[in-house]
Amino acid sequence: MGLQNEEKLELGCTGLQPKPKKWVLLMVRVVAFLATAAATLVMALNKETKTLVVATVGNTPIKVTLTAKFQHTPAFVFFVIANGMASFHNLLMIMVELCGQKLDYKGMRLAMVAILDMMTVALVSGGASAATFMAELGKNGNSHARWDKICDKFETFCDHGGAALIASSAGLILMMIISVMSIMKLLIKPKSDSS
């Protein structure tokens, strides 16, 4: 009689444990979606136009209007595409998490989610690394290659780019956590699935 009560208590406790983990993964994925979407939007809308004096002839200054856009740098374009794809991936995985039991094909759902999460980590990492390199070049220049810094002229452009990099880095860290959680979810199957 006492043994049956212990079994009921154990079954009751184990039945409740996976649910909080599911919501933790879901909430981390929502925050990662918000971070990568913010990085995408901030960088995609990043544009600054300035009129600069390039020379003076007599007393007349010669002015040139220059525009800094993310499209001018291929690394920033890749950054926007990578974070946009990560945002789409996270949105899709949120929907799979909410109604994933209906989409499970021969038990492959968890494996596919883990693989796609790892691919997304690699994609966001590449985009953030490329954009960080170009941001460093824009901030400090490269005296050996005679590339001048531009952040002293386009402060707002560089500030917005830095904010996008911070959001993308936060999204990358969250995506790494999600990837570990997805792999753990794949390796540790609930007891109801193993019987």
UniProtKB/Swiss-Prot annotation:
Instruction: List the membrane topology term(s).
Output: Multi-pass membrane protein
- Localization annotation: Cell membrane
What keywords is this UniProt entry annotated with?
Cell membrane, Membrane, Transmembrane, Transmembrane helix
Residue spans crossing the bilayer: 23-43, 76-96, 110-130, 164-184
Q: Where is the signal peptide?
A: none
Keyword Amino-acid biosynthesis appears in the UniProt entry: no
Principal localization? membrane
Which segments does the entry list as coiled coil? Answer: none
Extracellular topology ranges? 44-75, 131-163
Q: Mind telling me which InterPro entries this protein's record contains?
A: CASP/CASPL, CASP_dom, CASPL
Q: Which residues lie on this side of the membrane: Cytoplasmic?
A: 1-22, 97-109, 185-195
Q: Which Pfam families match?
A: CASP_dom
Q: Which GO terms describe its cellular component?
A: plasma membrane
Listed under subunit, the entry gives: Homodimer and heterodimers.
Q: Which family does it belong to?
A: Belongs to the Casparian strip membrane proteins (CASP) family.
Protein name (database record): CASP-like protein 1B1
Species this protein is from: Populus trichocarpa (Western balsam poplar)
